[in-house]
A protein has these predicted regions:
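Short, cationic-aromatic polyanion-contact patches
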Residues: 11, 44-67
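Alpha-helical residues within the helix-turn-helix
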Residues: 17, 34-35
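A short, conserved structural fragment
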Residues: 36-44
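Amphipathic alpha-helical dimerization/coiled-coil segments
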Residues: 61-117
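Extended, solvent-exposed segments with strong compositional bias
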Residues: 107-119, 177-233, 249-251
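Short beta-strands within extracellular/lumenal beta-sheet-rich domains
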Residues: 117-139, 221-225
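A short beta-strand element within beta-rich, extracytoplasmic domains
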Residues: 139-158
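Short coil-to-beta strand junction motifs in C2/discoidin
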Residues: 156-168
Length: 276
């Protein structure tokens, strides 16, 4: 990416398209370059309003030692569909595939759930499993989860807040307040049959955990660090999403897969690590 940006400043969408990766994966790598002071992002006017354009900070660099470090650093990625949960405590649950709606209330583990590209519920808790084999004999530098989500109301309600909490291996990380159940404008990925009166899109949220703490969309929100998560215990990493029963805004939630909303991705785990 550095060489590409050095040749020509680009937006996140342009970088992702050029490298055939998702926007969230591109953003993960761009954030690493920004943290190192190698590139910077500036808001500039474009055809569809302002967008962040990434520029190289220096005209020339020597990377002899950096190349050694970069060769040792590895990236692990895994996507899990919104219906591929391992645990679910949901009183009411619905999912939509690319073709139709399925009601999963009282049958949460029906095979229909694997068709899900959108899940909405009246609250409760849902947990997803990710491979943790990369954590064995490794030093983990950062692990992040990104997903598109919003609140859940009848049809849609743009001002319906919901406090949505995230945990890893049952260790609470942080709570994100969704500002609404968004509709009125069709989602970029909404299937043709999906009614205009329904929820259309969410917000892309990224939760990152490092040795310095937990970050929500790049802002530090918790002192919980990697060592608190026991990532190498058992055979999986359990990522949980839920409304606390005593939440100030118990606004339920929608989880978007790669065929609904505005972001073509499922629930994505990205980890940065080095082998021992």
């Amino acid at each position: 990416m550095f060489r590409q940006i050095n040749q020509q400043p680009m937006t996140l969408v342009e970088i992702a398209k050029l490298n055939s990766i998702t926007n969230s994966t591109a953003l993960f790598h761009l954030n690493l370059l920004q943290e190192g002071g190698i590139i910077e992002g500036r808001y500039l006017p474009g055809k569809k309003g302002k967008a962040i354009v990434y520029f190289v900070n220096f005209s020339g660099m020597l990377f002899k030692q950096a190349n050694v470090i970069n060769n040792q650093t590895k990236i692990f990625e895994q996507s899990v569909g919104v219906g591929e949960y391992l645990e679910a405590d949901l009183k009411v649950a619905h999912v939509a595939s690319q073709e139709k709606i399925y009601t999963l209330t009282n049958k949460l583990f029906s095979s229909d759930r694997f068709k899900a590209k959108l899940l909405w519920t009246d609250g409760g808790k849902v947990s997803y499993g990710f491979d943790n084999s990369f954590t064995f004999n490794s030093d983990i530098e950062e692990i992040s989860f990104s997903l598109e989500l919003c609140s859940e109301a009848r049809f849609y309600r743009n001002d319906w807040k919901s406090d949505i909490t995230f945990a890893v291996n049952n260790k609470e990380l942080c709570t994100y307040t969704s500002l609404g159940d968004f509709g009125g404008i069709r989602g970029k990925l909404s299937p043709d049959w999906w009614g205009n009166e329904n929820t259309q899109y969410g917000t892309l949220v990224t939760i990152s955990i490092t040795n310095d703490g937990t970050f929500l969309n790049s802002q530090k929100v918790s002192k919980t660090t990697l060592k608190d998560l026991d990532l190498n215990l058992g055979n999986k990493i359990l990522f949980s999403i839920y409304n606390k029963p005593n939440a100030q805004h118990y606004g339920e939630f929608n989880l978007f897969g790669d065929c609904f909303g505005n972001h073509k991705q499922d629930i994505l785990l990205v980890a940065k690590y080095t082998e021992k």
